[in-house]
Amino acid sequence: MTTQQTVKIQLVRSPIGTKESHRATVRGLGLRKLNSVSQLQDTPEVRGMINKISYLLKVL
């Protein structure tokens, strides 16, 4: 059995004033309020979303 790798991210900047697609990406990653933390599976799709809005996030 293989264990799934996970990545933990935290929203550190507000998505107010950003593109609508960036705000949708924040919601897609399961983040709502500032400093909220989400733990997701480490997949290429999630990595791409993190890369798209990296200026709003901190990877823990």
Curated annotation (Swiss-Prot):
It comes from the Bacteria. One of its GO terms (cellular component) is cytosolic large ribosomal subunit. InterPro entries: Ribo_uL30_ferredoxin-like_sf (IPR036919), Ribosomal_uL30_bac-type (IPR005996), Ribosomal_uL30_ferredoxin-like (IPR016082). GO terms for molecular function: structural constituent of ribosome. Keywords: Ribonucleoprotein, Ribosomal protein. Pfam families: Ribosomal_L30. GO terms for biological process: translation. Part of the 50S ribosomal subunit. Belongs to the universal ribosomal protein uL30 family. This is Large ribosomal subunit protein uL30. It comes from Verminephrobacter eiseniae (strain EF01-2).
